[in-house]
Each structure stands twice: as structure tokens, then as C-alpha cells.
Curated annotation (Swiss-Prot):
A GO CC term assigned to this protein in UniProt: plasma membrane
Alphabetically ordered keywords of this record: Cell membrane, Hydrolase, Lipid metabolism, Membrane, Transmembrane, Transmembrane helix
GO biological process: phospholipid dephosphorylation; phospholipid metabolic process
Enzyme Commission no: 3.1.3.4, 3.6.1.75
Membrane topology value: Multi-pass membrane protein
Region described as Phosphatase sequence motif II: spans on this chain: 148-151
Source organism of this protein record: Xenopus laevis
This protein's name: Phospholipid phosphatase 5
Region Phosphatase sequence motif III: start-end pairs: 200-210
Cysteine disulfide partners in this protein: none
Subcellular location: Cell membrane
Pathway listed: Lipid metabolism; phospholipid metabolism
Keyword Cell membrane on entry: yes
Length: 266
């Protein structure tokens, strides 16, 4: 690997470590304690579900490992080179890191109670005057981090990126790839999984529907933003190649054109 490329990759890796560090710090911070009005109490009286359909650890594994697995499969079946794998890994990791920071920042500022907040606050169901919680302090703090849904945003940041990467590799929207329904269906599978993960949070009474919808938009936004930082538009003919590959090819062509005695075939 070229020394300049290696140094650039090291810098990108350090940036992601810093971003993930900021995300982990934000996980430990306390959210704004929003006042709950009597007329909105019904929104937060849903039962507290101990066993989630998709636990947080499983969500992180799916969101992080799915893009990496698809990138590895692309190298195996589509003969993608090391540059493509590196660029895809950088794009996916940036999407997830930025998504985590922005999602947690909004959570901490808004401080919206979860649908099961009152049962976190009062496990015995007996509400005290002034809403002085008697439940586990950690559960109560987490109960004020409803908006937006982290499960939803991370699922769409990771699986949304995977869908874009697949669409590019299969050239679903480029002139040479349109008209093949199996390509489109294959690229939509990750999005279907992301939707299932997001909706499971409403079934577990961990999020309101607005939390899930906004979380999905945040995740998709960063998935698209980071994908386009490294890959061209899906409607371009060479959408399956990262910008760095295109730049390397252009540089090689320029060197050939500048070689004495070289003639361009028309």
C-alpha cells in the first residue's frame, strides 16, 4: 500500500476512534428532565417489558456486522478489490459513528419519557406526589431517552448503508442494471430488516412511533451522506466503484497520455 494512502487511512481510523469515544461519553450523560403534565400521563403508562424482542447488544451487532459481512461477500463474489473494501469500511463506520453522536445529542436535549416511563419510575404502580421516582435510578434515567429511537437510527445507519452498497454493486439504477427485479429486491432486504428492528421498539413499549420515524430519518440521512462521500451516484455507470478507484484510474490514464510517443486510440 502506498505510504500516502496508509497515512490517510490511519488518520481516518483515528477520527473514527475519537467519534466513537464521544458517543460512549454521551451514553453516560443525564438527559433533560422534562415536566410531565397530568393530561399526558396516559402516554407513559404502558407496561415495562424486561426482555426486548431485539436487545441492544443484538442491534449493535446487526448494525455493525451486516455492512462488514456484505463488503466481505462483495470481495468474494464480485471480485471487489482492497480499495473498495477499505472505502466501504470507512464509509459505514463514519455513518454509524456520526449517527450515534447526533442521536444521543438529541436524546439528551429533548429528554422525552418512554412509553413505559411511569412503570420505571414507580415499579409498584403507586404514583407519588410530584413524581418523585422510587424505581431503579438507571432505569429512570434511560426512561427519559425516548426521542429519537437509537435502535431505529442505528439500524438504518448500518443497514441503510448496506442497502446503498448493494444497490451500487448490483447497479440497480445504472443504465446497464435496470430492468432486473432480483437486483432491486436484494438491495431492499437490509431496509426491510431495519424496519423490523425499528418497529419492534414500539411493540416493546420502549418508543413512541414518532421516535422511530425520526430515528429512521436520522439513520438514513447519515447512511446516504457517508455513502456519497466515498461512492458516486447510483445512477452513474460506474456506481459500483469508489471515488478513489476512479481517481486512481484517471491518474494512470493521465500518466499514459503524458508519456512520449504514446498515441490515443480513437
Amino acid at each position: 500500500m502506498d505510504k500516502r494512502i496508509l497515512e490517510g487511512f490511519a488518520a481516518e481510523f483515528i477520527i473514527r476512534l475519537l467519534l466513537f469515544g464521544i458517543f460512549l461519553i454521551s451514553e453516560t450523560m443525564h438527559p433533560f428532565e422534562r415536566v410531565i403534565q397530568p393530561e399526558e400521563m396516559w402516554l407513559y403508562r404502558n407496561p415495562y417489558v424486561v426482555s426486548d424482542r431485539i436487545p441492544t447488544n443484538s442491534m449493535f451487532l446487526i448494525s455493525f456486522l451486516t455492512p462488514l459481512s456484505v463488503v466481505a461477500l462483495a470481495r468474494l463474489f464480485w471480485k471487489a478489490d482492497g480499495t473498495d473494501s477499505r472505502e466501504a469500511g470507512l464509509a459505514a463506520s463514519l455513518s454509524l459513528a456520526l449517527n450515534g453522536i447526533f442521536t444521543n445529542t438529541v436524546k439528551l436535549i429533548v429528554g422525552r419519557p418512554r412509553p413505559d416511563f411511569l412503570f420505571r419510575c414507580f415499579p409498584d404502580g403507586q404514583e407519588s406526589p410530584g413524581l418523585h421516582c422510587t424505581g431503579d435510578p438507571e432505569l429512570v434515567i434511560e426512561g427519559r431517552k425516548s426521542f429519537p429511537s437509537g435502535h431505529s437510527s442505528f439500524a438504518f445507519a448500518g443497514l441503510g448503508f448496506t442497502a446503498l452498497y448493494l444497490a451500487g454493486k448490483l447497479r440497480c439504477f445504472s443504465p446497464c442494471g435496470r430492468g432486473h427485479s432480483w437486483r432491486l429486491c436484494a438491495s431492499l432486504i437490509p431496509l426491510l430488516c431495519a424496519i423490523a428492528i425499528a418497529l419492534s421498539r414500539t411493540c416493546d413499549y420502549k418508543h413512541h412511533w414518532q421516535d422511530v420515524v425520526v430515528g429512521a430519518f436520522i439513520g438514513l440521512f447519515f447512511a446516504f451522506l457517508c455513502y456519497r462521500q466515498y461512492y458516486p451516484s447510483l445512477v452513474e455507470r460506474d456506481c459500483h466503484q469508489p471515488y478513489r478507484n476512479k481517481g486512481r484510474m484517471s491518474g494512470a490514464q493521465e500518466r499514459k497520455l503524458s508519456t512520449p510517443g504514446y498515441s490515443l486510440d480513437v
